[in-house]
From Swiss-Prot:
Residues 33-77, 136-150 are extracellular. Residues 1-11, 99-114, 172-185 are cytoplasmic. The lineage of its organism: Eukaryota, Metazoa, Chordata, Craniata, Vertebrata. This is Transmembrane protein 140. It is a multi-pass membrane protein. GO terms for cellular component: membrane. Keywords: Glycoprotein, Membrane, Transmembrane, Transmembrane helix. It is found in: Membrane. It comes from Homo sapiens (Human).
Amino acid sequence: MAGPRPRWRDQLLFMSIIVLVIVVICLMFYALLWEAGNLTDLPNLRIGFYNFCLWNEDTSTLQCHQFPELEALGVPRVGLGLARLGVYGSLVLTLFAPQPLLLAQCNSDERAWRLAVGFLAVSSVLLAGGLGLFLSYVWKWVRLSLPGPGFLALGSAQALLILLLIAMAVFPLRAERAESKLESC
């Protein structure tokens, strides 16, 4: 016979979810802002959402390409724009998730909880779509042995977003009727 969970267990689950959201935000900030969106950053290759530099054998230097040259290499402008929109939009939506989570916990508001789940779900879809679209265009230059810390951070953020969604679905917010709203914060 399963009884109600103790209050401390609910608080521990909530704090774990908040910590995971903060870790995802930090990973995405690191990859997209600190690393400037570079997924591969080697001395002879730099490929990211805003950099596309390949090694030039003739001059023995790293040559960065802009859009007319990128389209000739097979990287469409619209595709790269959609990939950027997906990845950076994911960061923005993830930044909005902690506030509804805190409001849901303090006010026992299931609608705010669902809003936070929605933000994280759309963020996960945008990140996966943007990263997948970008990798589909640059796959001939980037191999699995070449990902840099930015790519690993985005991949980890995606995995944690999926884990967050699973945790939030398995352990939904439970409204507590017996306590006042001030005691629940």
